[in-house]
C-alpha cells in the first residue's frame, strides 16, 4: 500500500470511529458493535487491491451518513407507553420539508424502487 493510500485509509478509519462516537455515545453495546464491524472490514481489506480507493471512499461515505443522518431514540425500559426521546446532535442534517408544503399534488414515481 502506498504511503498516500495508507494515510487515506487511516484517515477514513478515524472518521468512521469519530462518527460512531458521536452517534452512539449513549449506547455502549451498539457503539462497541459498530466499532468492531469497522475494524473487521478494515482488517479484511488490509491488503491493497484494485478497489482500495473505492473502499476508502465507501468508509468516508458511511461515516458521513452516520454523522448526518442517523438519529437514535430511546425510552424508559419497561414502559412501553413512554415517549421516545431522540438524540439529535448538532451535526444532524435537517430538512426543510418543502415537499410537504406543496400539498395535494400527485406524486409520480418514474421507476421502481429496486431499479
Swiss-Prot record:
It is found in: Mitochondrion matrix. GO terms for molecular function: protein folding chaperone. InterPro entries: Complex1_LYR_LYRM7, MZM1/LYRM7. GO terms for cellular component: mitochondrial matrix. The keyword Mitochondrion applies. Residues 1-23 form a transit peptide. Keywords: Chaperone, Mitochondrion, Transit peptide. GO terms for biological process: mitochondrial respiratory chain complex III assembly. Interacts with RIP1. Belongs to the complex I LYR family. MZM1 subfamily. PANTHER family: COMPLEX III ASSEMBLY FACTOR LYRM7 (PTHR46749:SF1). Assembly factor required for Rieske Fe-S protein RIP1 incorporation into the cytochrome b-c1 (CIII) complex. Functions as a chaperone, binding to this subunit within the mitochondrial matrix and stabilizing it prior to its translocation and insertion into the late CIII dimeric intermediate within the mitochondrial inner membrane. Modulates the mitochondrial matrix zinc pool. This is Mitochondrial zinc maintenance protein 1, mitochondrial. The lineage of its organism: Eukaryota, Fungi, Dikarya, Ascomycota, Pezizomycotina.
Amino acid at each position: 500500500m502506498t504511503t498516500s493510500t495508507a494515510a487515506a485509509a487511516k484517515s477514513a478509519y478515524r472518521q468512521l470511529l469519530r462518527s460512531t462516537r458521536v452517534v452512539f455515545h449513549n449506547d455502549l453495546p451498539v457503539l462497541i458493535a459498530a466499532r468492531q464491524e469497522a475494524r473487521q472490514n478494515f482488517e479484511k481489506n488490509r491488503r491493497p487491491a484494485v478497489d482500495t480507493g473505492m473502499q476508502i471512499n465507501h468508509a468516508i461515505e458511511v461515516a458521513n451518513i452516520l454523522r448526518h443522518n442517523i438519529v437514535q431514540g430511546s425510552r424508559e425500559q419497561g414502559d412501553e407507553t413512554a415517549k421516545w426521546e431522540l438524540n439529535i446532535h448538532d451535526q444532524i442534517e435537517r430538512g426543510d420539508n418543502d415537499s410537504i408544503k406543496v400539498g395535494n399534488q400527485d406524486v409520480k414515481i418514474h421507476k421502481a424502487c429496486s431499479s
